[in-house]
Swiss-Prot record:
Record's catalysed reaction(s): L-lysyl(4)-[histone H3] + 3 S-adenosyl-L-methionine = N(6),N(6),N(6)-trimethyl-L-lysyl(4)-[histone H3] + 3 S-adenosyl-L-homocysteine + 3 H(+); N(6)-methyl-L-lysyl(4)-[histone H3] + S-adenosyl-L-methionine = N(6),N(6)-dimethyl-L-lysyl(4)-[histone H3] + S-adenosyl-L-homocysteine + H(+); N(6),N(6)-dimethyl-L-lysyl(4)-[histone H3] + S-adenosyl-L-methionine = N(6),N(6),N(6)-trimethyl-L-lysyl(4)-[histone H3] + S-adenosyl-L-homocysteine + H(+)
SUPFAM superfamilies cross-referenced by the UniProt entry: RNA-binding domain, RBD, SET domain
Compositionally biased residues, Low complexity: 9-52, 115-148, 211-231, 552-584, 617-663, 812-829, 843-860, 1065-1077, 1213-1223, 1243-1255, 1292-1316
Coiled coil ranges: 359-400, 717-744, 1177-1255
Protein name: Histone-lysine N-methyltransferase set1
Keyword rRNA-binding included in the entry's annotation: no
Subunit note: Component of the Set1C/COMPASS complex.
Effects seen without this gene: Cells display unusually rapid development, characterized by precocious aggregation into multicellular aggregates, and completely lack mono-, di- and trimethylation of H3K4 ('Lys-5' of histone 3). Cells also induce premature differentiation.
Pfam families: SET
Gene: set1
Length: 1486
């Protein structure tokens, strides 16, 4: 029965297709039949039995999943493309999608869900199955719609285009819009596309790709196996569009086809019409910008069915079902009916074999199918009747729930996010509500679309516009009102706040002003009160101090009327000093009492500190005893006037004049004390030029200078420096001298010219006190006689500096002392004049048989003291020659004793002081031999002070006279010339002047030492006779050239700790000193060739690393290198090679005129003292000169050529290493003796000889003056003390930094760990790891390797050091010089430097507790930068008892290349970047 019903329906549909141009009722019946067929097909699919596997696969569609439609894709016409806003969220969710075998078509997107209808194919012409009937009915309606659209007017077609152009894709509406629909599906309308529309409109033709219509070729396997024929349709004949508002962004078309077999599509279209209440003809699509209007004929063409609440003929929503169609006629039994014909639009194909087989099967089952169709029709009629009676939606059939796909089991309905049904089978979605009729029951009846007038549309638009405008106007008005109200409120609030703020500010300001005013008033009041109190107290003190002064002066004048003027002055001095002390004790102030001056003092020029724009009156303050000077002046005036009233008046006047100055001086003292309070000053005083501040220690003084130099007090900039003058000591000396002059009886007639013995003793005393080799400042420390002091100062002032050719300027202290002595000498009418020639000629002679030389010298040279018949010094009468000779030198007072040098350690100074007595004992052993020698060389005092004398002021000696004396002495005694070493000095014309070996300040410490950046020459060896004697003279010359910039060193020669008790191997050396003149400045180059035994190589290498050991062995291998290693050269003459020296062996003839040589001695032309001599003495001196010149001329002519040849041979042997160190002692002595004989015989430079006899061994002096060449001994105990390798300490002093190997660095690190005192910062670690080393190289090698360098801007960092000459590998570059401090001081200084912002660190460790700080005091070595691939290395060398840091060249350094070495910082977390830019750069310093 069912099969018969299907066939009838198909025939009915065919008849309806043929009558497609009938009225609307036919159309409605067609729609009803379509729906009926759909429902029947839907119900029959579950009960149909499968004939074969292919049938089951096609007909059992409800059992398949909703996504299995991909396997049945046949083309565009057989698909239902449903677009929904939920598609994308559903696809992107966690839902599992079943994979299919058939791939998607190229134009199909995953976001578009395609549902295949239960029909087999919409293009099949005939079908006996249920699927065929449905597709046939569907295609019938489509064809009807297309045919209806053909008759439409042009206006309607244009309107369709307008609708098409208004469609928009609202993908941007991500949030849920306010849809008037119950489901969240798209808003759909139906538009038909005519075949002619493709040719007229180009935009619609591109909506569908031909690929969508022609994709059925590859899906033939899904077609039903029934005997039906399939035909392909062109996209232009049968394409319908469904407009969707929710398309994805990657969609290219806005509409797709629709099949009316799906009731949901019709249902959605109906809801679009019924959603708008006011105007039922507008489409309320949210996605459309403008509402759309559909005419009645378009609504008819849509073919809306009223089965689910569609519209009837009058376009009213009706719930009544349409009238039932007449039952179809019964099918003929025999023969079977032909298959239905296809519509004329479709082009059919011939049936395939499968279709024929299927038709045969249908014919066999025809009766069974007709019965099924009849049963179906009866069931449908019953259902329709029930629906009409109940007027409600039929219940959902739940019979297929068991066959629901597993994918949709978890698909539960969510009211907030409803899920759209994806298939036309409503039974699969029980949770989805299809409320079709209930939704529209409350809606009023709408007017038909035909009654709508287009003229109403503008009116409605104007009405809405006016309404909206009024609404917006009210809103803007309210908005402006609220804005103005808020603005006014804020303005008032801000106004009040500003008013309150200003009021509070003024109130606070007034209150602060009143407070400050009261405070200032109280401060000024207290200050004025204190000032008045001090002024009154000072006035009272002055009255008490000066009131007894007239009485003391009157009594002294009355009682001592018969005494001399000098006695009066002495009495006045004592009385005024007593009054001054009594007045100051009442003050009970710490700084008011006269305190004995401290040796640790600083000076500040008085020009820096001015009061009221003027300097303080000198009379008001001259040291701490300034009041005494004022009283002395007043008392002197009173004594001269002999009037008490005048005395009082003078005192009052002076007090009034000095009143203001005293208060100003006190203010300055207070300010200075406050400024230097942190360093614990002892006393503050001043003299004519400086303010002085005494401290308790040299460390406090140095710190005060370092920190406060350049600081300001108010607007005064302080120029702080070490105390240079010694005014207070001079005042004490003047007082002592006045006492001595007053107490001693002075003989009237005493002539030194007639008393030669007294003259000798005076000279011996001067030599013992070193007055002949010291400056006028040092004379004041060892005060002797006023007359001798005056004479030496007079000669000192007349002396012309041989280097600068300028007269020396005596400072204020010297002038003051000289003036004081002149006053004393004027009173005693004594004018002594002592010639230097007499003093030098007999400095230390004793009563010996060889004293005739001194007596002959004095008879020929005027060396006597001319007293002009006015008397002699008071102490000459008491001179006892024996007592003066045997009496030891009194020790210096604690104030006069020089402080310990800051550069050297305390143990060294103590050792020097303690060993003085031992050296005296050693010197006493040679007294027997000294008595037999000439006084010039054999004096005990001369032996002790031979080196210190050279370092003092220059010795002005006439070389012509010395040569004559030595020549005469040589012919008289005929001693054999036997010696251990020979010394040859070749001088130029200007070099006959003895260089200035001077040092003005005995208290000079290391601060002065480090002020010159290149003060390398300050390195000194132990000055004992056992030290390296061959370098003594050259060392002094070197010091002279280093210190000729004004920074002098006056240190006494330090004694050796060994005291000559440890015997060292003897050494014989040959020293040659050459003086040349270059650019107006004399330079001396001394080459010392050692012939002593070389230290054992194993002993040296034991304390050295591999590199140093190889270097030492290489040096020891050649005799030439050994000589150069132990040779000494001055840094200025170092560039002169040996060939240059040998190229100019001849020397110009020195001038014999004293005036040409700029010697400040007695001459006939320019010396006034020479003219004061008696005429017999002048004649005698001229005659001596003439004889002296003749003898020298003869001697020079004889030996001119021999000395040159021998000198060249001597140099060539020394430089080429021809001398053999293993020669016997006899051979060396013979060679030296022969060379010295030839040199002395051929002396072309006015060189003289002298003979010494020490322990039976004769020694010949080359220069004729032992002072100029250094005293040498051949005694075994005191001959030579060889320098040894420094022992290795805890920190590895011998571990050199030159190797740069891992072994040396690791050993250094281990030694550091054992020390346990590692620094905690990278800055302080810099001086821990810069490198250590030790070398047997002495000071001689250091001086010979000195190079020319300069500092300028560096590419690495700030400033750098650059080479000005080519430096060979392993040559010395420079010494690292700075302040020598202890570890604790270094730690404190580092913290202070960090606080001051000093970024660079210049601390260099020497040993465990010795660090060199070059931050403020140092030389150019402080500018050497770090490099990971350096060209230099740092070594620590032990020279004498001192350790020096020497920078050596690691490789050859070219001119202009920067000098660098490795800082060797430890590894730390905080890295310091490296800027060396070398290929081996480690990027960090630590």
């Amino acid at each position: 029965m069912e099969n018969e019903t299907i066939v009838d329906n198909s025939l009915n549909n065919k008849s309806n297709v043929n009558n497609s141009n009938n009225d609307i009722n036919n159309s409605k019946s067609n729609n009803n039949n379509t729906n009926t067929n759909y429902n029947n097909n839907h119900n029959n699919t579950t009960t149909t039995t499968t004939i074969n596997k292919t049938e089951e696969k096609q007909n059992d569609s409800p059992k398949d999943s909703e996504f299995e439609f991909l396997d049945e894709l046949k083309g565009v016409d057989d698909q239902h493309h449903v677009f929904s806003s939920e598609d994308e969220s559903y696809t992107n969710g966690n839902k599992k999608r079943k994979q299919t075998d058939t791939p998607l078509s190229p134009n199909q997107d995953l976001k578009k869900r395609s549902i295949t209808s239960p029909t087999t194919s919409p293009t099949t012409s005939t079908s006996t199955s249920t699927s065929t009937s449905t597709s046939t009915s569907t295609s019938t309606i489509i064809n009807n719609n297309n045919n209806n659209l053909k008759d439409k007017t042009k206006e309607e077609i244009e309107f369709i285009k307008h609708i098409r152009s208004q469609l928009v894709k609202p993908k941007f509406l991500k949030d849920k819009p306010n849809f008037p629909l119950r489901s969240s599906g798209g808003n759909w309308i139906f538009v038909g596309k005519l075949p002619s529309l493709q040719s007229t409109t180009t935009d619609n033709t591109t909506l569908m790709s031909p690929n969508n219509a022609t994709t059925t070729n590859g899906s033939s396997s899904n077609i039903s196996t029934t005997t039906t024929t399939t035909t392909t349709t062109t996209p232009t004949t049968k394409i319908l569009y469904r407009v969707n508002g929710f398309l994805s962004d990657n969609e290219t078309i806005d509409s797709i086809e629709i099949n009316f077999g799906d009731p949901r599509d019709r249902y959605e279209i109906e809801r679009l019409h019924s959603s708008r209440i006011n105007n039922p003809f507008e489409l309320p699509c949210v996605s459309f910008k403008n509402p759309l209007f559909i005419k009645s004929n378009i609504a008819k063409d849509i073919g809306i069915s009223n089965e689910y609440g569609g519209m009837n003929d009058s376009f009213e929503f009706s719930n009544q079902p349409p009238p039932p169609s007449p039952p179809p006629p019964p099918p003929p039994t025999l023969p079977p009916p032909p298959p239905p014909t296809l519509p004329p639009q479709h082009s059919l194909e011939q049936q395939s074999t499968k279709q024929q087989i299927f038709t045969q099967q249908q014919q066999q089952q025809q009766q069974q199918q007709q019965q099924q169709q009849q049963q179906q029709q009866q069931q449908q009629q019953q259902q329709q009747q029930q629906q009409q009676q109940q007027q409600q939606i039929p219940k959902i059939n739940q019979q297929h729930y068991s066959t629901q796909p597993s994918v949709l089991i978890d698909d539960i309905y969510d009211p907030s996010n409803p899920t759209e049904p994806i298939s036309p089978h409503q039974d699969h979605y029980p949770n989805f509500i299809f409320s079709k009729l209930q939704r529209y029951e409350h809606l009023p009846t709408r007017n038909p679309i035909s009654q709508y007038d287009y003229r109403d549309r503008p009116r409605d638009w104007e009405r809405d516009r006016d309404r909206d405008w009024e609404r917006d106007r009210d809103w803007e008005r309210d908005r402006d009102r609220e804005r103005d109200r808020d603005r006014d409120r804020d303005w008032e609030r801000d106004r009040d706040w500003e008013r309150d703020r200003d009021w509070e500010r003024d109130r606070d300001r007034d209150r602060d002003w009143e407070r400050d005013r009261d405070r200032d008033w109280e401060r000024d009041r207290d200050r004025d009160w204190e000032r008045d109190r001090e002024r009154d107290r000072d006035r009272y003190d002055r009255q008490t101090n000066f009131s007894p002064a007239p009485q003391s002066t009157t009594t002294s004048a009355s009682t001592s009327s018969t005494t001399s003027s000098t006695d009066k002055n002495s009495n006045n001095t004592t009385s005024t000093s007593v009054s001054a002390t009594t007045s100051t004790t009442k003050r009970k102030s710490k700084f008011s009492e006269p305190i004995e001056p401290s040796p640790f003092a600083i000076q500040i020029p008085r020009d820096n500190i001015k009061i009221n724009g003027n300097l303080i009156n000198n009379s008001s303050s001259s040291s701490s005893s300034g009041n005494n000077n004022n009283n002395n002046n007043n008392n002197n005036n009173n004594n001269n006037n002999n009037n008490n009233n005048n005395n009082n008046n003078n005192n009052n006047n002076n007090n009034s004049n000095n009143n203001n100055n005293n208060s100003d001086v006190k203010d300055i003292k207070d300010k200075l004390l406050k400024q230097f309070k942190i360093y614990d000053p002892v006393n503050v005083y001043m003299d004519e030029s400086y303010w002085y501040i005494d401290f308790r220690s040299s460390e406090s003084r140095e710190r005060a200078i370092q920190v406060l130099n350049g600081s300001f007090i108010d607007t005064w900039k302080l120029n702080v420096d070490n105390k240079k003058t010694n005014t207070i000591n001079e005042e004490l000396q003047k007082q002592k001298q006045l006492e001595n002059d007053s107490n001693n009886n002075k003989p009237n007639n005493f002539n030194l010219l007639e008393n030669e013995r007294s003259l000798k003793e005076i000279c011996k005393l001067l030599v013992a006190t070193e007055l002949l080799s010291t400056s006028s400042k040092d004379i004041s420390k060892n005060f002797i006689e006023a007359e001798i002091l005056k004479t030496i100062k007079l000669l000192d002032s007349q002396r012309i500096d041989p280097l600068t050719q300028n007269s020396t300027i005596i400072n204020n202290t010297t002038n003051t002392t000289t003036s004081n002595i002149n006053n004393t000498s004027n009173n005693t009418t004594v004018t002594p004049i002592v010639t230097p020639k007499s003093i030098i000629s007999a400095p230390t002679s004793r009563d010996s048989p060889r004293g005739g030389r001194s007596s002959s010298t004095t008879t020929k040279k005027p060396s006597k003291l001319d007293l002009n018949g006015s008397g002699v010094p008071p102490t000459l009468k008491k001179l006892d020659t024996i007592k003066q000779q045997q009496q030891p030198q009194p020790p210096l007072s604690p104030l006069k004793r020089p402080p310990k040098s800051h550069f050297y350690s305390d143990s060294e100074d103590d050792g020097n002081n303690n060993n003085d007595d031992d050296d005296d004992d050693d010197d006493d052993e040679d007294d027997d031999f000294d008595q037999e020698l000439s006084p010039l060389h054999s004096s005990r005092d001369s032996k002790k002070n031979i080196k210190s004398i050279i370092k003092k002021k220059p010795i002005y000696s006439d070389d012509d006279d010395d040569h004559y004396h030595h020549h005469n002495h040589h012919h008289n005694h005929h001693h054999h010339h036997h010696h251990d070493r020979s010394e040859v000095e070749l001088y130029n014309e200007s070099d006959l002047q003895v260089d200035v070996l001077d040092s003005d300040n005995e208290n000079q410490d290391e601060s002065d030492y480090h002020k010159s950046s290149d003060n390398f020459g300050h390195v000194e060896l132990s000055d004992d006779d056992n030290e390296f004697d061959s370098l003594d003279t050259d060392q002094d010359l070197y010091d002279t050239e280093e210190n000729d910039n004004g920074k002098k060193s006056n240190k006494r020669p330090r004694k050796s700790k060994f005291n000559g008790k440890s015997k060292k191997p003897t050494t014989t050396t040959s020293t040659t000193t050459t003086a040349t003149k270059s650019k107006g400045r004399s330079k001396k180059t001394t080459i010392t060739t050692p012939t002593h035994n070389i230290p054992v190589l194993d002993e040296i290498q034991s304390n050295l690393d591999d590199e140093d050991a190889s270097y030492v062995s290489m040096v020891m291998a050649a005799d030439k290198d050994i000589k150069l290693l132990f040779s000494t050269k001055s840094e200025e003459g170092f560039e002169d090679s040996s060939q240059e020296i040998l190229s100019t062996p001849t020397r110009t003839k020195p001038s014999r005129n004293r005036k040409e040589r700029n010697l400040p001695f007695l001459d006939e032309e320019d010396d006034e003292s020479f003219k004061q001599l008696p005429q017999p003495q002048q004649k005698q001196e001229k005659q001596e000169k003439h004889e002296h010149k003749l003898k020298n001329k003869e001697l020079k002519q004889k030996n001119n050529e021999v000395i040159i040849n021998k000198t060249e041979e001597h140099f060539s042997e020394n430089l080429n290493g021809d001398n053999n160190n293993n020669n016997d002692k006899s051979e060396n002595e013979n060679e030296n003796e022969n060379e010295n004989k030839n040199e002395n015989e051929n002396d072309n430079n006015n060189l003289n000889t002298s003979i010494d006899n020490i322990n039976g061994v004769e020694r010949r002096s080359i220069t004729g003056c032992a002072r100029s060449e250094g005293y040498t001994r051949s005694d075994i105990q005191k001959l030579f003390k060889r320098k040894q390798v420094a022992p290795t300490g805890k920190r590895g002093a011998a571990s050199s930094a030159s190797s740069g190997s891992n072994s040396s660095s690791s050993s250094t690190a281990e030694s550091f760990e054992t020390g346990g005192n590692l620094s905690k910062s990278a800055r302080s670690s810099r001086f821990d790891n810069r490198g250590f080393g030790s070398d047997p190289i002495t000071l001689a090698s250091l001086k010979s390797r000195r190079k020319r360098i300069k500092f300028e801007r560096s590419d690495i960092h700030d400033w750098g050091l650059f080479a000005m000459e080519t430096i060979s590998a392993k040559d010395m570059v420079i010494e690292y010089i700075g302040e020598v401090i202890r570890q604790k001081v270094a730690d404190e200084r580092e913290k202070r430097y960090v606080k001051k912002g000093i970024g660079s660190s210049y601390l260099f460790r020497v040993d465990d507790d010795t660090i060199i700080d070059a931050t403020f005091k140092g030389n150019l070595a402080r500018f050497i930068n770090h490099c990971c691939d350096p060209n230099c290395i740092a070594k620590v060398l032990t020279i004498g008892n001192q350790k020096k840091i020497i920078i050596y060249a690691k490789r050859d350094i070219n001119i202009g290349e920067e000098i660098t070495y490795d800082y060797k910082f430890p590894i730390e977390d905080v890295k310091i970047p490296c800027l060396c830019k070398s290929p081996k750069c480690r990027q960090t310093l630590n």
